[in-house]
């Protein structure tokens, strides 16, 4: 389980001070980037060394409760499944120990031509399902 902390800034909210719905996807994207870094990689190095580019193929999300300006949020990410060229994550956002957003995200590894390719062994070997 990987955790990423963030705060709701003015730029994340609508005119009512509530997080705009699409920004929850930004929050979980940032958490995924930090997850890769915590595993010892960077998106840039994966691209340069392996022609490896992770894209979202499918996302299923459930908005449970709104976050508001200056709320402290925790994004918890865990791997659910890994296959040859893809992996699935569960990413949930918490506010004060209460889940406010749930998602399952299917990521596919592609090359610059857009073709699915095998996840590098050096990365798949450190992914715990």
Show the residue positions of the predicted features.
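Terminal targeting signals and extreme-terminal segments of soluble enzymes
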Residues: 1-72, 80-129
């Amino acid at each position: 389980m990987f955790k990423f902390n963030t705060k709701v800034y003015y730029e994340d909210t609508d005119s009512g001070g509530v997080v705009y719905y699409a920004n929850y996807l930004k929050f979980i994207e940032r958490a995924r980037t930090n997850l890769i870094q915590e595993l010892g990689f960077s998106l840039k190095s994966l691209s340069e060394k392996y022609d490896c580019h992770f894209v979202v193929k499918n996302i299923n999300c459930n908005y449970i409760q709104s976050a508001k300006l200056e709320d402290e949020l925790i994004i918890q990410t865990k791997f659910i499944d890994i296959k040859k060229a893809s992996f699935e994550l569960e990413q949930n956002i918490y506010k004060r120990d209460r889940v406010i957003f749930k998602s399952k995200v299917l990521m596919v590894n592609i090359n610059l031509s857009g073709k699915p390719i095998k996840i590098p062994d050096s990365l798949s070997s450190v992914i715990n399902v």
